[in-house]
Amino acid sequence: MAITAGMVKELREMTGAGMMDCKKALSETNGDMDAAVEFLRKNGQAKAEKKAGRIAAEGIVKTVVKDDKVAAIVEVNSETDFVAKNDEFQGFVEAVANQVVDSEAADLDAFMAEAWEADTTKTVKDALVEKIAVIGENLNIRRFEKVAADNGVVVPYIHGGGRIGVLVVADTDVVNDEIKAALKNVAMQVAAMSPKYVSREEVSQDYLDHEKEILLAQAKKENPEKPENIIEKMIIRRLNKELKEICLLDQVYVQDSDLTVGKYVDKVAKENGANVKVTKFVRFETGEGIEKKVDDFAAEVAAQAGM
């Protein structure tokens, strides 16, 4: 069967694959469009396996919020910042985030095995593998989290075009623009200052005991002549200072250093006749904790050439 330019164009639009790849697929399958799509999928999977050894440490974080009540945050990684800014990649990440917000998956493995909402004949993993083939880089759906505000609101914040994403969950009996704007400011605080806990009540006794042990050793080394009662007071002061840095509500509010974040939230709540309590936050930063692989140039060229 003769392969026409129109057939190649149609297959390209269906799959996003390159022109020569589409022409080859149609030739190999005698012009059968469905078989050609399957041929490209199989070819894409082979390419994806070769690319899987490369480190995907760039990418973006995306958030999706439904009705101010349910939200999802996802991190999807690429190998390069160039691809992270690509519309094809960003559209895929948005589709992943939209699927997460509707998903009941308990973990990443379960999510990857779900039917892909855009084409239920595929799984999420299949969709990822196909996107790897189209984009030409190793991609990785690294993590996600879904949150719900049963008695309040969820507010998102994205910083740096997706480099950092934050969700803040709050219980509130008033939901208006002022309350949501204040919670967005809190989300910006989380992005900038990276707290570990909402409040001191969340800090475990094990963590406190561990920190006290470290601070005690430091204080004794720095002040060997001081009595135990003085050392104890020093430890308490240092621990309080540390807690003010790692607990969101105790942090100095970056937009007004006269207030803590907790006092800022209380101030806005009072102005709006509301009761507002921040109950949870989630912060994802692209690539955090991923060790980037460094190859010499010759090895990189050889790897990409399949040598």
Predicted features by range, described:
Residues A2-M307:
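N-terminal assembly/interaction segments in proteins that build large macromolecular machines
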